[in-house]
Amino acid sequence: MNQKTILVLLILAVITIFALVCVLLVGRGGDGGEPSQLPHCPSISPSAQPWTHPGQSQLFADLSREELTAVMRFLTQRLGPGLVDAAQAQPSDNCIFSVELQLPPKAAALAHLDRGSPPPAREALAIILFGRQPQPNVSELVVGPLPHPSYMRDVTVEHHGGPLPYHRRPVLFQEYLDIDQMIFDRELPQASGLLHHCCFYKRRGRNLVTMTTAPRGLQSGDRATWFGLYYNISGAGFFLHHVGLELLVNHKALDPAHWTIQKVFYQGRYYDSLAQLEAQFEAGLVNVVLIPDNGTGGSWSLKSPVPPGPAPPLQFYPQGPRFSVQGSRVASSLWTFSFGLGAFSGPRIFDVRFQGERLVYEISLQEALAIYGGNSPAAMTTRYVDGGFGMGKYATPLTRGVDCPYLATYVDWHFLLESRAPKTIRDAFCVFEQNQGLPLRRHHSDLYSHYFGGLAETVQVIRSMSTLLNYDYVWDMVFHPSGAIEIRFYATGYISSAFLFGATGKYGNQVSEHTLGTVHTHSAHFKVDLDIAGLENWVWAEDMVFVPMAVPWSPEHQLQRLQVTRKLLETEEQAAFLMGSATPRYLYLASNHSNKWGHPRGYRIQMLSFAGKPLPQNSSMAKGFSWERYQLAVTQRKEEEPSSSSVFNQNDPWAATVDFSDFINNETIAGKDLVAWVTAGFLHIPHAEDIPNTVTVGNGVGFFLRPYNFFDEDPSFYSADSIYFRGDQDAGACEVNPLACLPQAAACAPDLPAFSHGGFSHN
């Protein structure tokens, strides 16, 4: 081979190698190698925007930091120098417990929203604890107008018919600290021998923690609480590490020095005091079960034992978000509404409109309840009325990518509770549009003609979460393109446990060597103020019946014909359905206006609940949560019946501040402004798979509000997201099928913000 031939071959080899490299580079850019740089998707700022001008939507906006500060300053001046910061207040002190928005009267709000009248005065509601007065009491004061308050008025008598007894007040954080100090510094040393033996006791080392129960006693006027003791497991749920010791603390006295331990329960037996327990232990009369301190190992920890894997699926907005959040107002092409958070009652929405027409004045969580069973005193007496702790107060920051989609819009919440200055929960709400991965409607036709039509369901969601002791609640309000509204809550977090002893099968399941997962029910109550084509509404019940008949063309044969039954419910008693009773399968509120087909325009309430049995009515505390007895009740709307529960019901359910059953007094509901009160819940018998946490799957309940002849046809028919093509069309052409354009429209990389978390303390 001559030199010239070799040179030609070398040149050809270089060209071939260069061509192969080019092919490889192009291939890697398009088929899974190092990706070529995609353009960023167009986007609007993912954060909520502040108010740009005074507007109607601010009627329902929670108080700003500036407004909370102004109210606090005004009250401090008016109530005098005797006020103590609630963060350090003793029971014998005067303090401002809470300040939050006083909702405007509905008539005044609608006059402003619909007729352009001046907005009602913006006001705050403050709860004051007067422990230093000759007759200690709790008062409610309305302060206004905001942002520059000039008046306050005492509304305690107006709201409650008289002064509120002081024993009904919520337990302040300082009171819990004083109880802990009493238990650990004064009481537990009396049983140090037993505690060293069973529980690795370290005086002042605090390897143990307490957990409260509620209510606090056995009759009105009591303030005596069972506290369970658990290992203090850092970084994991102590709720699963019960050591078998429970203490009944009487903390009714205004001076903590006079608080006492009334009873002691240890691993299945009752004692009069810790000193008696210690004496019997020293005498060899106490059968002690040693409880290992497992630390954060095993299944108690939420830290995964496996390394991270590939990134999970991610939803994003290829052409930018299709909704906006300004202040507390959410707007999309279909839905608008205002949102907020009651300090005690939790999430709420107002002035909900679909395609510009108001459907709902208010949907608000009212109360949540967990009733426990067990063979220890703490377990058997626990009825957590969560509004008494505060479902807004104990809202938590939402973790991006876990609690909500990574690209959701996050909104802060400002509050003033047990403090002289307002605090902020960062990312307390999230708002997002979600593709459900499910068709809202579809049909594929191979019969007579060939075509496909459908619509992928995308929903607008607003979400918040509350962590109340061991449980985490997810509160969802979901808006569908069909005009339906879905309200749902989920329970997750840690179960509440008890020390395992005796015949436990009646009270739950064993979930660890010494741990009983105690049976309990979850219930939540919602206020639904529907305004269907106006304020005058009627309640209709429809169901089904089979009616026997002779077959018309063959009379000797019988046929069971399915028919619809209809009944107008005219009184509150007729529209109050007890838990477990037969409820019409279709119950809807309707106006006296008709749709195109002559039917009353209505909205149906469809339950999604498998609630446990309510507390028997002969229970001494049943009045404290009488709403739990009704799966659904419809009443006349009254300003003097704003809520079905009260922050004060937890600590005195025996003489309830608000008894919901009083709302149902057989008044007419025909052609009136109506409120539907809905209970959703479920029975939870904890099991092994609740360790370490209860999962949301199967533990979500709620209800739908669905149009029922409200429209002339399905409003989603007009959705710009609809897809339709025939068999003789090219479904891959953009002009025929918008989904065919998706490879170009969505050929962009989402602009992901840096991960952030709202933290574990509020500033």
UniProtKB/Swiss-Prot annotation:
Residues 1-5 are cytoplasmic. Glycans are attached at N137, N232, N294, N592, N618, N666. Gene3D superfamilies: 3.10.450.40, Copper amine oxidase, catalytic domain. Ca(2+) 2 binds at E572, E641, F663, N665, E667. SUPFAM superfamilies: Amine oxidase catalytic domain, Amine oxidase N-terminal region. The chain crosses the membrane at residues 6-26. This is Amine oxidase [copper-containing] 3. The lineage of its organism: Eukaryota, Metazoa, Chordata, Craniata, Vertebrata.
